[in-house]
Amino acid sequence: MKNNLLSEKLIYTGDSLTPTHLHLCTYNATEMQESSGDTFQSVKETLDNERINWLQVHGLKDTETIREICSHFEIDFLVLQDILNANHPTKIEEHDKYIVLILKIFYPNEHKEDDDLDGLLQQQVCIILGNNYVLTFLEKETDFFDEINAALRNDILKIRSRLTDYLLSVLLNSIMANYISTISSIDDALEDLEEELLMITNENDIGIQILSLIHI
């Protein structure tokens, strides 16, 4: 594996072919404006330093667009490389003007076969929290944060009156809910597997041995 600290290249290391698409929500306590596009220039004019700006990036294929975004918000080049590294370990990193979080979210594999054990897929999400902005980078087009978009449009619980740290907490709450749901689905699958193993009556069978070890 090459040392990225010595490289000036920007390479997305994941396997998603999703074209890069941007969605910007700019808001304050009284109003909200949205814009979407495939380039940073197409949404840049909507940015407002007097408001909260939440820029959602879906698809990391266009590394030059990712570079433009990070350059505008003065994000360090090494952080930019981390965003594009789909296999980056989970981390929270504090910088002078912003905080970086790299996490994973999980979702069902809709194309798996009945005997396929790989029932869960994952994708990386990177969140950058600044003074008046939040940036979220996802590998694929997804509705994962749609509930938060709807809450902003309808100003649920006066969410638009809050600062960026509150938006971050809402984003993290959605991710934590995803973890809980994922763990629950794994527990259900393990219970189903245990029931199948209990139907085996041969005491010498490997299934019985596994169960005995589980319940020691």
Range-by-range predicted roles:
Residues 1-214:
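Peripheral, non-transmembrane regulatory/ligand-interaction domains of membrane transport proteins
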